[in-house]
Amino acid sequence: METLKDKTLQELEELQNDSEAIDQLALESPEVQDLQLEREMALATNRSLAERNLEFQGPLEISRSNLSDKYQELRKLVERCQEQKAKLEKFSSALQPGTLLDLLQVEGMKIEGESEAMAEKFLEGEVPLETFLENFSSMRMLSHLRRVRVEKLQEVVRKPRASQELAGDAPPPRPPPPVRPVPQGTPPVVEEQPQPPSAMPPYPLPYSLSPSLPVGSTAHGALPPAPFPVVSQPSFYSGPLGPTYPAAQPGPRGAAGYSWSPQRSTPPRPGYPGTPTGASGPGYPLAGGRALSPGYPQQSPYPATGGKPPYPIQPQLPSFPGQPQPSVPLQPPYPPGPAPPYGFPPPPGPAWPGY
């Protein structure tokens, strides 16, 4: 196009009428020159590749002939393998336990028949004694050996059949349960391990299994009288059904060398019957049937109450929901009254200087 740009209109008209000039102009264009160069380069490349392929022609022919030979050898090996396989099947069919059992049974019956025929001939006198002894013993031995082999082979044949029958009668194994998919948002549930049984009870008891009084301080000298500690404890006990027996009230301590007397005792409390003494009546009978002599202090067979029990009490058990509550107002289990002195009244007779 650059060559046509500089030409005049007259030159262009002449060029249009000249076909040779147009062809020359097309061949001199750069596009056609590039295509021609690419064509020559492709031809040179193809020529070099063809020459290289011709160099591999000899090894290719040799490899092809080797492949043909190997294929022929393979066919021969396949035919030989088929022949060996047929022989193996023939031998294996002849050596099957069932086939061997049949052959042994036939041979056993045959040798047994021959031994019986030998015995009959010997009985008829056709066979001499020496020949009979030599042949009959060997025949019977062979017959017994074959019989034992037949029995053992029968056991071998029966075992696989029994195992197959048991396997056929057994139910098919159950498939494992399908695994449930766990949602991604839900954390995996951890199975709680069972707790071992503990030695402590599941509910704390309000009392000890071995009740005992707390250890106090060591006493030196005379012990002062002191009542038991008072613990408030509601109870369902409504009091004694029979008449109560008041405790004997200790009187003032006598002087040294003087014994106790009824005149020195304190008068009984109002509302309770006084303790019978020697002045008012006979004493309480003892276990042996002997009554105490009048003039000695009489001790009540029941411990002194004074509104407090003579032993430490336990706190009340906790109430559970649904437990029936008592409708009767709670009453103390002992009649009210002043606390008696600690222990029993002092013994009669001369007082011990340690008190």
From Swiss-Prot:
Give the primary localization class: membrane
Q: How does it sit in the membrane?
A: Peripheral membrane protein
| Function statement | Component of the ESCRT-I complex, a regulator of vesicular trafficking process. Required for the sorting of endocytic ubiquitinated cargos into multivesicular bodies. May be involved in cell growth and differentiation.
Biased-composition ranges, Pro residues, are 170-186, 194-205, 321-355
Q: Family assignment? A: Belongs to the VPS37 family.
Cross-referenced InterPro entries, in alphabetical order? ESCRT_assembly_dom, Mod_r
In this chain, composition skew of type Low complexity spans: 246-257
What are the VPS37 C-terminal domain coordinates in residue numbering? Answer: 78-167
BP GO annotations: macroautophagy; multivesicular body assembly; protein targeting to membrane; protein targeting to vacuole; ubiquitin-dependent protein catabolic process via the multivesicular body sorting pathway; viral budding via host ESCRT complex
Localization of this protein: Late endosome membrane
Self-association and partners = Component of the ESCRT-I complex (endosomal sorting complex required for transport I) which consists of TSG101, VPS28, a VPS37 protein (VPS37A to -D) and MVB12A or MVB12B in a 1:1:1:1 stoichiometry. Interacts with TSG101, VPS28, MVB12A and MVB12B. Component of the ESCRT-I complex (endosomal sorting complex required for transport I) which consists of TSG101, VPS28, a VPS37 protein (VPS37A to -D) and UBAP1 in a 1:1:1:1 stoichiometry. Interacts with HGS and STAM2. Interacts with CEP55.
- Any one annotated GO CC term: late endosome membrane
Q: Which SUPFAM superfamilies match?
A: Endosomal sorting complex assembly domain
What is the species listed in this Swiss-Prot or TrEMBL entry? Pongo abelii (Sumatran orangutan)
Question: Residues bearing Phosphoserine?
Answer: S29
Which interval of the chain is the signal sequence? none
Its taxonomic path starts at:
Eukaryota, Metazoa, Chordata, Craniata, Vertebrata
- Give the region (Disordered) as residue ranges: 159-355
What name is this protein filed under?
A: Vacuolar protein sorting-associated protein 37C
Keywords, alphabetical: Endosome, Membrane, Phosphoprotein, Protein transport, Transport
Q: State the source organism's domain of life.
A: Eukaryota
